[in-house]
Amino acid sequence: MRILLSNDDGIHAPGIQTLAKALREFAEVQVVAPDRNRSGASNSLTLESSLRTFTFENGDIAVQMGTPTDCVYLGVNALMRPRPDIVVSGINAGPNLGDDVIYSGTVAAAMEGRHLGFPALAVSLNGYQHYDTAAAVTCTILRALSREPLRTGRILNINVPDLPLDQIKGIRVTRCGNRHPADQVIPQKDPRGNTLYWIGPPGDKRDAGPGTDFAAVDEGYVSVTPLHVDLTAHQAHEVVSDWLERVGVDGQW
């Protein structure tokens, strides 16, 4: 199995280093990751400037100022030959649950892999300690995928409780919950008296009931949420069509 491995915490982050070491026990791994923390970069792609890469002695490649999406795009289209069998993103420091997937660079890297035609996993740890647990879970899932590929064009968003491996209760397939909208902005003054703003933490859980990714992780289970790239709200087609006909917008400009 050939794996393109990226993340959004940066190439030196403990999550990606732990996962790369574990994956190399049974797979060919090419790391292509940002040279610094790009958390919250979502699906941003660098278009107005060039991208420079640096290759370490072990073959890992850092993309200077690159986003997670940049890294996967370059990895698939230029840096990994032959191309990968699968794209893996993580292990993220902290969860990507519910609305987090909108902003997450970890999920975005996997989404770019899927967009380019490859199976993709995004892996996050609900904390900052037991990266070895998340790595073991990821390796188990990847070994299973190598034996029997998943017949669905979906991204698997995997969130792992921050627990020792022997305390993980199992795996649940979940849906995304959601949070209350975040509204905290923290102002500060720089030495010249200008105002700086920091975006505050995410909102509290709102929909975290049974079946959600929040609930699974809180109860000690690995959460696996299938995601897809198509953002079309297919069930809303008829509602929107009826509304447009009713209000008479068509042809009124």
Curated annotation (Swiss-Prot):
Cofactor binding mode and count: Binds 1 divalent metal cation per subunit.
Enzyme class label: hydrolase
Primary location class: cytoplasm
Keyword DNA-binding annotated: no
Location in the cell: Cytoplasm
Reported cofactor(s): a divalent metal cation
Catalysed reaction, written as an equation: a ribonucleoside 5'-phosphate + H2O = a ribonucleoside + phosphate; a ribonucleoside 3'-phosphate + H2O = a ribonucleoside + phosphate; [phosphate](n) + H2O = [phosphate](n-1) + phosphate + H(+)
An example Gene Ontology molecular-function term: 5'-nucleotidase activity
SUPFAM superfamilies, per the entry: SurE-like
Disulfide partners: none
EC number: 3.1.3.5, 3.1.3.6, 3.6.1.11
Chain residues that bind a divalent metal cation: 8-9, 39, 92
Pfam families in the record: SurE
A GO CC term assigned to this protein in UniProt: cytoplasm
Keywords attached to this entry: Cytoplasm, Hydrolase, Metal-binding, Nucleotide-binding
Function recorded in the entry: Nucleotidase with a broad substrate specificity as it can dephosphorylate various ribo- and deoxyribonucleoside 5'-monophosphates and ribonucleoside 3'-monophosphates with highest affinity to 3'-AMP. Also hydrolyzes polyphosphate (exopolyphosphatase activity) with the preference for short-chain-length substrates (P20-25). Might be involved in the regulation of dNTP and NTP pools, and in the turnover of 3'-mononucleotides produced by numerous intracellular RNases (T1, T2, and F) during the degradation of various RNAs.
Sequence similarity: Belongs to the SurE nucleotidase family.
Protein's UniProt name: 5'/3'-nucleotidase SurE
Species of provenance: Klebsiella pneumoniae (strain 342)
Lineage, highest ranks first: Bacteria, Pseudomonadati, Pseudomonadota, Gammaproteobacteria, Enterobacterales
Gene name as annotated: surE
